[in-house]
Amino acid sequence: LAGGSTDLQEFIENYGYGSVISFPCNIYTYITLFKDKGGYNKLNTYLLNYTQREEVEQTKDIHNDIGRVVLEHFNCPPVTLNFHSDVFASGSGLASSSSYLISCIKAVSTHLNVQMNTWEMCELGLELERKFNPLTGYQDIYGCATEGLKQLVFLKDGSVTYAGLRKDFLNQFKMYLRPTGIQRSSTRVLSSIDTKRSEALLPFVSHMSDAIKKNDVSKFLGLMQASWEVKKSTSPLILENEKLKEMDRFLYKDKSILAHRLCGAGNGGFFLIFRDKNYNEPVLDIPIGVAETPYLCTKN
């Protein structure tokens, strides 16, 4: 909702800290893990099913980045991993890789009886994701794994603080995701971010936190829209695609929309839309809410 780009390592190194306000939505990724004990499948083979199917004998040969880094880290014996999600998530801007990564860490650690708390999973998740996406920031991993509407502060020493915000605030809206139909590479966009311009995003976080605490809906919506305008100025790639520019203009003109912004690094994915809680007109947008649990783990 506010502060995106200040969670990037380069920004934190330059300015000492970064901060965001975010929430996990109730669109999930799922990892199911199966260990063959009866020999019905190959006992010495790793099987991964996602948009592709992989069958390998060594983890180093796994093409799926998430499956490979997690299984290698835990030195996990051969298992079957199945990846599922509620929406098509590749290049979506919905932090799907971080969500899958946290779910995979949870599934494998549970399978191996390795006890890990949420913060330990976040620290490991960030370390592992940076092996295949070195520019990834803090907010995706920590935002996916921690519950509710909150402010996260990322410090230069690597520590992260969590401050929960009033849970009922977002009940005053109906929230939607509008797909752009455009997939994008977050790495390309993140590498183009101007950290000097991103500094202007930090004040929005503290002001928005204050508005939420005071239940000031009008101020919250104004800050969200204003921060989106500043966000667009931090990189020419955020709205590089003409279709995105057209959609952005269209959303501004829609009187039912109180505020909107593009999710993720930019240049594709989904727009997040806020409407009044009493809005009842049919829409093609995907309705969302705040996730009751940040991640789900299924162990078979």
Question: PLM features: residue spans?
Answer:
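Stable alpha-helical structural segments in soluble proteins, enriched in small hydrophobic residues
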Residues: 99-111
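Glycine-centered small-residue motifs that form tight turns
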Residues: 18, 268-269
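C-terminal nucleotide
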Residues: 6-13, 22-23, 30-75, 85, ...
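Helix-loop-helix module between adjacent transmembrane segments
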Residues: 90-92
